[in-house]
């Protein structure tokens, strides 16, 4: 079976969904921008050599409908001969796109795939047009469809206090602020034009969602939003609503060698699992365990971890379940996470994998893990290995 290598990964800045930078930029344009940029950064790979495009997106309607992968590819002037498909595993969609593209290469069906994802949550809200089957409640708790209530459940089961959640949320903003100021995001962000608060067109090369002024006092003052009476999950300890896209170029190792490319990492293992929808946020735990088993590794072998922060309560429950609380500050979400950057659903999987790749290079570690929870009870994980 062919080894799959990552040639490059980039993302857009994360724009605030409510009146943010991309309020006049469409999801297809965010996607096409990255498709074009990847080939400018990697001119040795010709666009006509792409065997397929896999693009994650959750709300496939309005501007994100009718196969946004193909629409974006056409906007990016990618040759018409290159096919494209939109992938939906909810929050894990662009990581699933990575897995789908990788499997095509592993089986010899492809040499090069372009993968990524997008979500414009300002233009296409998360619940737009959603209509759950009435009989679903016969087998699944009604509250399982409300992500914030699943986080509340995890907080209760794993004894995650309000104070722990607020501290974790603050850490996310502080880490993301430090990463921005130090230039840690520079290699992964592909600047793009949007509009500032005054409606003036400007070039954005930073994430506008991060709150550099976040503090515990303000976080503690927020009221629980999902369970106002006995809850502890607030807007401040939940992932921000944001708009963004991410993209990666992956190839077979033999193709990269023949073309004289210098791959940045090798995909060691991939895993997707199911779990109880009522505790959907715990999915990264069994997904990580499965990915480690497939890779023949133990968690101690992993030098850097990107865990998508859907909620602080959910993230802390996973870290507790993986025995990572004590090593969190040395390994996990070192540049902050979705609480600070936001969680554009179809974008996040490839986004955290790209951030992971850059962190591994900066910290000179061999193995890295990207993992995330998925609404309605799933988890997904990818382990990558740096290449010299």
Swiss-Prot record:
Could you tell me which pathway this protein works in? Lipid metabolism; fatty acid beta-oxidation
Q: Which GO terms describe its cellular component?
A: cytoplasm
Keywords, A to Z, come to: Acyltransferase, Cytoplasm, Fatty acid metabolism, Lipid degradation, Lipid metabolism, Transferase
Its Gene Ontology biological processes?
fatty acid beta-oxidation; phenylacetate catabolic process
**EC class of the enzyme, as a word:** transferase
What the entry lists under NCBIfam families is as follows: AcCoA-C-Actrans, fadA, PRK08947.1
Gene that encodes the chain: fadA
EC number(s) given by UniProt: 2.3.1.16
**Which reaction is this enzyme known to catalyze?**
an acyl-CoA + acetyl-CoA = a 3-oxoacyl-CoA + CoA
Family recorded in the similarity comment: Belongs to the thiolase-like superfamily. Thiolase family.
- In the UniProt record, the signal sequence range is none
Name listed for the protein in its UniProt record: 3-ketoacyl-CoA thiolase
Specify one Pfam family: Thiolase_C
Keyword Cell membrane attached = no
Q: What organism is recorded for this protein?
A: Photorhabdus laumondii subsp. laumondii (strain DSM 15139 / CIP 105565 / TT01)
What are the transmembrane regions?
Answer: none
**According to its UniProt record, where is this protein located?**
Cytoplasm
**Cited function:** Catalyzes the final step of fatty acid oxidation in which acetyl-CoA is released and the CoA ester of a fatty acid two carbons shorter is formed.
Q: Which residues does the Swiss-Prot or TrEMBL record annotate as the active site?
A: 91, 343, 373
What HAMAP family does the record tag this protein with? Answer: FadA
* Keyword Ribosomal protein included in the entry's annotation: no
Subunit (UniProt): Heterotetramer of two alpha chains (FadB) and two beta chains (FadA).
For molecular function, the Gene Ontology terms on record are: acetyl-CoA C-acyltransferase activity
């Amino acid at each position: 079976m062919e080894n799959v290598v990552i040639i490059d990964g980039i993302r857009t800045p994360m724009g605030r969904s409510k009146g943010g930078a991309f309020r006049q930029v469409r999801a297809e344009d965010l996607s096409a921008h990255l498709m074009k940029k990847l080939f400018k950064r990697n001119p040795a790979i010709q666009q006509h050599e792409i065997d397929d495009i896999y693009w994650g997106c959750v709300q496939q309607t309005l501007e994100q409908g009718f196969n946004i992968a193909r629409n974006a590819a056409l906007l990016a002037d990618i040759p018409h001969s290159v096919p494209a498909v939109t992938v939906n595993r909810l929050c894990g969609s662009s990581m699933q796109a990575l897995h789908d593209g990788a499997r095509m290469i592993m089986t010899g069906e492809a040499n090069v795939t372009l993968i990524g994802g997008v979500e414009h949550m300002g233009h296409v809200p998360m619940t737009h047009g959603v209509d759950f089957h009435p009989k679903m409640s016969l087998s699944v708790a009604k509250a399982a469809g409300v992500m914030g209530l699943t986080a509340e459940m995890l907080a209760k089961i794993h004894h995650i206090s309000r104070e722990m959640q607020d501290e974790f949320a603050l850490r996310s903003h502080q880490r993301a602020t430090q990463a921005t100021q130090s230039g840690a995001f520079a290699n992964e962000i592909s600047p793009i034009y949007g509009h500032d608060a005054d409606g003036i067109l400007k070039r954005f090369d930073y994430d506008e969602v991060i709150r550099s002024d976040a503090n515990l006092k303000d976080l503690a003052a927020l009221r629980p939003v999902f369970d106002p009476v006995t809850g502890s999950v607030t807007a401040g300890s939940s992932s921000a609503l944001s708009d963004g896209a991410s993209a990666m170029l992956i190839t077979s190792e033999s193709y990269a060698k023949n073309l004289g490319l210098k791959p940045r990492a090798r995909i060691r293992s991939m895993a997707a699992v199911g779990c109880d929808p009522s505790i959907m946020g715990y999915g990264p735990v069994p997904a990580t365990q499965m990915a480690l088993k497939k890779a023949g590794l133990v968690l101690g072998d992993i030098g850097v971890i990107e865990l998508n922060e859907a909620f602080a309560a959910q993230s802390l429950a996973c870290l507790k379940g993986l025995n990572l609380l004590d090593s969190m500050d040395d390994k996990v979400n070192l540049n902050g996470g979705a609480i600070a950057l936001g969680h554009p659903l179809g974008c996040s999987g490839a986004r955290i994998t790209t951030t992971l790749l850059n962190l591994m290079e900066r910290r000179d570690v061999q193995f890295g893990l990207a993992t995330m929870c998925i609404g309605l009870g799933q988890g997904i994980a990818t382990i990558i290995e740096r290449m010299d």
